[in-house]
């Protein structure tokens, strides 16, 4: 089941970032995301039912999953899509939000009491370096300030959601957790 869920997650997740810059040319970023997450939540609900996951869970866990969804999908993807609508390129937005693992590791020690190993830091450094090398950026391009701010909000949303989920919603199955997250973002 985890393999199926992984493919489902990759499909839904990657399609948003890739298609976002094109979508906001024809639709409001937030209307597009609302439509997207209504569809995604329906798919995760169906997936959860097929695999007989327990959908009715403790209200507190539902609340925590929904906060994660608002932070992750609302602020993160909302910030990214809004930055596109303000004229920021997907390239620069990706460079900003790919700082998320670095920021998460910096905050996970004090908040989650986790120790980040030197090996993890090296991996994150090379991942960020690889992103810069693969994506690159044209320094001569004019950069819209509002778009940069929206991408920073997206970065903070993804970081907060990652920490929140690790702290509060790690006991929920992935498909049910994603159902409530997508539902709250829609």
Predicted regions, residues:
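Glycine-/small-residue-enriched transmembrane alpha-helix faces in small-molecule transporters
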Residues: 1-34, 142-167, 185-186
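Cytoplasmic-side transmembrane-helix entry/capping segments in multi-pass membrane proteins
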Residues: 6-7, 60-68, 116-128, 147-148, ...
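Juxtamembrane C-cap of transmembrane helices in multi-pass membrane transport proteins
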Residues: 15-27, 39, 77-88, 96, ...
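Alpha-helical transmembrane segments of compact multi-pass small-molecule transporters, enriched
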Residues: 16, 39-43, 96-110, 125, ...
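Specific transmembrane alpha-helical segments of multi-pass solute transporters/efflux pumps
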Residues: 16-17, 45-97, 105, 133
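Residues that define the loop-to-transmembrane-helix transition and helix capping
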Residues: 30-31, 91, 117, 175
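Hydrophobic transmembrane alpha-helices of multi-pass small-molecule transport proteins
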Residues: 44, 116-136, 155
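Membrane-interface helix caps and helix-loop-helix hairpins in membrane proteins
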Residues: 82-88, 113, 136-144
């Amino acid at each position: 089941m985890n393999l199926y869920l992984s493919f489902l997650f990759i499909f839904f997740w990657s399609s948003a970032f890739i298609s976002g810059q094109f979508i906001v040319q024809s639709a409001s970023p937030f209307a597009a995301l609302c439509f997207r997450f209504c569809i995604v939540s329906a798919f995760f609900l169906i997936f959860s039912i097929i695999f007989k996951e327990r959908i009715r869970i403790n209200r507190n866990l539902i609340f925590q999953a929904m906060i994660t969804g608002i932070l992750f999908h609302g602020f993160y993807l909302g910030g990214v899509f809004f930055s596109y609508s303000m004229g920021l390129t997907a390239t620069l937005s990706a460079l900003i939000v790919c700082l998320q693992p670095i920021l998460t590791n910096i905050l996970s020690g004090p908040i989650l009491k986790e120790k980040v190993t030197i090996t993890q830091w090296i991996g994150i450094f090379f991942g960020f370096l690889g992103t810069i090398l693969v994506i690159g950026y044209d320094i001569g391009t004019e950069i819209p300030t509002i778009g940069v701010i929206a991408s920073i909000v997206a970065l903070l949303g993804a970081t907060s959601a990652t920490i929140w989920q690790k702290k509060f919603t790690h006991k929920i199955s992935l498909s049910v957790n994603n159902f409530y997250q997508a539902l709250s973002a829609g």
